[in-house]
Amino acid sequence: MATTTEKLKNFFAELRRVLLVTKKPGWKEFKMAAKITGIGMILIGLIGLVIRMIGYLITGA
């Protein structure tokens, strides 16, 4: 069974490995991700609005 110190060492070793593999996105990639995220947020909001309006029409409250 691993001790707390060994668990921490393993965690930081895995963290370091992940950080070495990752890279900073370019401006084009960042803009695309921001657009997709924004569109997703708007769609989720619109779906919630439609559900709320349907509920309002059904209950009449």
From Swiss-Prot:
Transmembrane segments: 38-58
PROSITE patterns: SECE_SEC61G
Keywords: Cell membrane, Membrane, Protein transport, Translocation, Transmembrane, Transmembrane helix, Transport
Gene Ontology terms, MF aspect: protein transmembrane transporter activity
GO cellular-component term (any): plasma membrane
Entry keyword annotation includes Protease: no
GO terms of biological process kind: intracellular protein transmembrane transport; protein secretion; protein targeting
A family per Pfam: SecE
Compartment annotation: Cell membrane
Keyword Cell inner membrane: no
Domain of life, source organism: Archaea
Major subcellular location class: membrane
Membrane disposition: Single-pass membrane protein
HAMAP family: SecE
Subunit-level organization: Component of the Sec protein translocase complex. Heterotrimer consisting of SecY (alpha), SecG (beta) and SecE (gamma) subunits. The heterotrimers can form oligomers, although 1 heterotrimer is thought to be able to translocate proteins. Interacts with the ribosome. May interact with SecDF, and other proteins may be involved.
Family: Belongs to the SecE/SEC61-gamma family.
Function: Essential subunit of the Sec protein translocation channel SecYEG. Clamps together the 2 halves of SecY. May contact the channel plug during translocation.
Protein name according to UniProt: Protein translocase subunit SecE
Source organism: Thermococcus onnurineus (strain NA1)
Organism lineage string: Archaea, Methanobacteriati, Methanobacteriota, Thermococci, Thermococcales
Annotated gene: secE
